[in-house]
């Protein structure tokens, strides 16, 4: 297959970068400007809910639904920049990733990281969505882990590497890419 035809097939934008560089902020700006329906998930470390022993809880929330905090969506804890995953927590969310979405909706995965890399059902659901035609806007950690490498190297994905220096101008580039995917 020619290089040009591979690029033409790409449907999904992956925002790749280190911790705290602005991946989620960029995604939020793009989504607000696109003004379309969005489904998917976002993960959030809740520092204000920190437990002295365990650290800060990390939850997964369905985009568009009210946030809640329960065992059902608790993924693990982060203490001193080290995470402890709750076994099978991501796998419990896998079915939600594969639910049908209305026409004209984009998917947002904020973010795909290393905690879920050992959760087969969740990883398979992410890869199945990447194989599909619904445009995806996702934040992806820049760690060298087999699952994350598989996501970043997926033939349907275009990686946008974010830095503190380029993050403001990258918004327009990602926005243009996503607009083109929605219009197809």
Model-identified regions with their sequence ranges:
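Hydrophobic anchor at the beta1->P-loop junction of P-loop NTPases
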Residues: 15
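The conserved Walker
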Residues: 19
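Conserved lysine of the Walker
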Residues: 23
